């Protein structure tokens, strides 16, 4: 019986179909059970891996508040008084045993931003190594190294700003290989019609890690002192590493406890999608317009993501004037929404493809449009509703939540167009997508010298415009099928 939505998806003869070029599509196998399966065990272990990863990344944002002498930061106070104070100031009494440092706002900016200078370097090398040697050890040791460096943060702070900046850059080097390595592993583990579910579960750990680590770091600072923030998350990272090394394999063929049926299901579903080339087709890859569609979308999405990740607490405090307890909670809520959206959108995307016969390209386009234009609309709205606290928080939460749709959009399109080189492709796109983390907050701060509502409207409008441009570019030039250059030595390929 013809699907009632089949007319909405590209037909077999259309350019946007999901047909594998040159080779015949493998027959669709009956999915192996989900319960206790090796592929879902990998998804949940990687979920906790990215939970740890983002906990290690963002904990400094909270600890830094307790590390810096309040007398040093008082002169940098740029609170806007356009909005009335949301509630009476609360005198926060907490443990004062942690050492204090006299770092001004510019120095703190260098400390927080130094992470990205290491992070951007290892993206492409990480993808290349993972595609050649597998992603298990690379991802595991990337997080393990970051955890070890995190344990040395208090010592580096005592040595001085230079040592702490260098340590944060080393943490960035370690984390830079993780996403490309994970993509490379999923190229061997994720059946095409389960990619959205499996990858959204994996990467959703990053959002939940942000939600949990921000308030938890505050609690640790409150009851103990800031040094224990780094000791706690560093030890958690080491424990995860031990579990990862013991329980995970690079491929279904090398997994010790996978059932024969599940292994055959995965291998048969990936038949004719993986390349037998020994060399990486760099030239055709870099000339591929579908790859650059992902680059533009990834860059655009991250501009908004990193701007909010680093400056949302500032907006809550200096413009909306929430107190520190409210700020910590409300800054984490949007990422809880994003986490839920990632999980649910992954289920929805694969159901649309498997049960309703929507094409991969259609799903990737629509989910990217929702996940980029939706946040743009609500981000602009948040800037223009003035001092309405409830609406401002609601719009910022909705904006960040809708961004979760992108986890089943452009974020995993690398696996659709070139599964054999997915790690390398993610390394390329994430290299460009790291740039907003380096320059976006700097530009935003330069546009908000007085922290007025009008200045923040400009920041939000710029981010929204970049998001919309990225969504349109991806919609026009993305593809949903494996490209010719990714499966053979054939030098020509369709764009």
Curated annotation (Swiss-Prot):
PROSITE patterns noted in UniProt: MFS (PS50850)
Topology term for the membrane: Multi-pass membrane protein
Tissues/organs with expression: Significantly expressed in lung endothelial cells, and much less in liver.
Protein's cellular compartments: Basolateral cell membrane; Cytoplasmic vesicle, Secretory vesicle, Synaptic vesicle membrane; Lysosome membrane
GO molecular function, one term: symporter activity
InterPro entries: MFS, MFS_dom, MFS_Na/Anion_cotransporter, MFS_trans_sf
Motif (Dileucine internalization motif): 22-23
Any single GO CC term annotated in Swiss-Prot or TrEMBL for this entry: basolateral plasma membrane
Entry-annotated residues carrying Phosphoserine: 3
Substrates-to-products reaction catalysed: N-acetylneuraminate(in) + H(+)(in) = N-acetylneuraminate(out) + H(+)(out); D-glucuronate(out) + H(+)(out) = D-glucuronate(in) + H(+)(in); 2 nitrate(out) + H(+)(out) = 2 nitrate(in) + H(+)(in); L-aspartate(out) = L-aspartate(in)
CDD domains linked to this entry: MFS_SLC17A5
Keyword terms, alphabetized: Cell membrane, Cytoplasmic vesicle, Glycoprotein, Lysosome, Membrane, Phosphoprotein, Receptor, Symport, Synapse, Transmembrane, Transmembrane helix, Transport
Family under the similarity heading: Belongs to the major facilitator superfamily. Sodium/anion cotransporter family.
Name used for this protein in its record: Sialin
Lineage of the species this protein comes from: Eukaryota, Metazoa, Chordata, Craniata, Vertebrata
Gene that encodes the chain: SLC17A5
């Amino acid at each position: 019986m013809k699907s009632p939505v089949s007319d909405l998806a590209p037909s077999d003869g259309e350019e946007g179909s999901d047909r594998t070029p040159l080779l015949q599509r493998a027959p669709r196998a009956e999915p192996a059970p989900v319960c206790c399966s090796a592929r879902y065990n990998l998804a949940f272990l990687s979920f906790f891996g990215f939970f740890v990863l983002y906990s290690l990344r963002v904990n400094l944002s909270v600890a830094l508040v307790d590390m810096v002498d309040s007398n040093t930061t008082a002169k940098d106070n740029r609170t806007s008084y356009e909005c009335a104070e949301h509630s009476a100031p609360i005198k926060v009494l907490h443990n004062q045993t942690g050492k204090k440092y006299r770092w001004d706002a510019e120095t703190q900016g260098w400390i927080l931003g130094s992470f990205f200078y290491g992070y951007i370097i290892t993206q492409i090398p990480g993808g290349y190594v993972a595609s050649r040697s597998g992603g298990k050890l690379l991802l595991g040791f990337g997080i393990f190294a970051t955890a070890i460096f995190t344990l040395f943060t208090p010592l580096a702070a005592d040595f001085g700003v230079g040592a702490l900046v260098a340590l944060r850059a080393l943490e960035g080097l370690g984390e830079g290989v993780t996403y490309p390595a994970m993509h490379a592993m999923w190229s061997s583990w994720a059946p095409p019609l389960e990619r959205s579910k499996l990858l959204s579960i994996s990467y959703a750990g990053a959002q939940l890690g942000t939600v949990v680590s921000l308030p938890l770091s505050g609690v640790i600072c409150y009851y103990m002192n800031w040094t224990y923030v780094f000791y706690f998350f560093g030890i958690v990272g080491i424990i995860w590493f031990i579990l990862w090394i013991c329980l995970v394999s690079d491929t279904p063929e090398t997994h010790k406890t996978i059932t024969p049926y599940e292994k055959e299901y995965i291998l048969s579903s990936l038949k004719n999608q993986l390349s037998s080339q020994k060399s990486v087709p760099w030239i055709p890859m870099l000339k591929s317009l579908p790859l650059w569609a992902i680059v533009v979308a990834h860059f655009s999405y991250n501009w908004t993501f990193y701007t909010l990740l680093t400056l949302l607490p500032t907006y809550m405090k200096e413009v909306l004037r929430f107190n520190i307890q409210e700020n910590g909670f409300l800054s984490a809520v949007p990422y809880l929404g994003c986490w839920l959206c990632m999980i649910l959108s992954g289920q929805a995307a694969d159901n649309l493809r498997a049960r309703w016969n929507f094409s991969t390209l259609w799903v990737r386009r629509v989910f990217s449009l929702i996940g980029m234009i939706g946040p743009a609309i609500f981000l602009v709205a948040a800037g223009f509703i003035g001092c309405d606290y409830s609406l401002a928080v609601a719009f910022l939460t909705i904006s960040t939540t809708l961004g979760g749709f992108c986890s089943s959009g452009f974020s995993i399109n690398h696996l659709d167009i070139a599964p054999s080189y997915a790690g390398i492709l993610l390394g390329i796109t994430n290299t460009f997508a790291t740039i907003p983390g380096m320059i976006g907050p700097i530009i935003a701060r330069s546009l908000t010298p007085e922290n007025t509502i009008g200045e923040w409207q400009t920041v939000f409008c710029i981010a929204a415009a970049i998001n919309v441009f990225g969504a349109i570019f991806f919609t026009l030039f993305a593809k949903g099928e494996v490209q010719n250059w990714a499966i053979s030595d054939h030098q020509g390929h369709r764009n």
